[in-house]
Design a protein with these regions (language model features):
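Residues that scaffold the ATP/ADP-binding catalytic core of kinase and kinase-like folds
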Residues: 24, 47, 132
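Nudix hydrolase/Nudix homology domain
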Residues: 31-35, 102-151
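The catalytic Nudix box helix
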Residues: 39-73
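Active-site-adjacent beta-strand/loop module that shapes the phosphate/pyrophosphate-binding cleft
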Residues: 78-109, 122, 144
């Protein structure tokens, strides 16, 4: 079996004033039936810290520009292995929490890979997230959020 490609990533738990979290609907370009929901974020650029990467990804994927310091420290970290576009990855990722009043998501800064694998976004309530049968990541997302904020 092939060794996984090591990848560092940063993600943002973006929660609005209605206590909803923003998730993007993605799919594997090599298998479009492999669908999932995930938080804004992605791989770090060379030399980039997790907080810098989280702020950059947040702007690229939502149009929301913030200073990295606005994100504070990571609230969660995990390591996941997954296959995407026929490649096996081992991804270490830091999650940051950002609460905002509201936001009209702007995806015009998506890169080519995001345009090829993300087709929509949605603001989810915790009840909707807990009730859905659709896969989302991290799988502990509702528990994680409830442990961080009162929803």
């Amino acid at each position: 079996m092939a060794q996984p490609i090591a990848r560092l990533a940063a993600r943002v738990l973006l929660i609005d004033e209605a206590e909803r979290i923003l998730l993007f609907h993605g799919f594997d370009p090599a298998d479009p039936t492999d669908e999932f929901w995930l938080t804004p974020g992605g791989g770090l650029d060379p030399g980039e810290s997790p907080v810098q990467g989280a702020a950059r990804e947040l702007f690229e994927e939502t149009g929301l520009r913030i200073a990295p310091a606005d994100l504070g420290e990571p609230v969660f970290r995990n390591v996941v292995e997954f296959t995407f576009n026929t490649r096996l990855y081992r991804q270490e990722q830091d999650f940051f929490l950002l609460r905002i009043p509201s936001w009209d998501v702007d995806t015009t800064n998506f890169d080519e890979g995001e345009r090829a694998s993300v087709d929509r976004y949605r603001w989810w309530t915790m009840a909707e997230l807990e009730a859905t049968a659709e896969p989302y990541y991290p799988e502990s997302l509702p528990t994680l959020i409830r442990g961080l904020v009162e929803v």
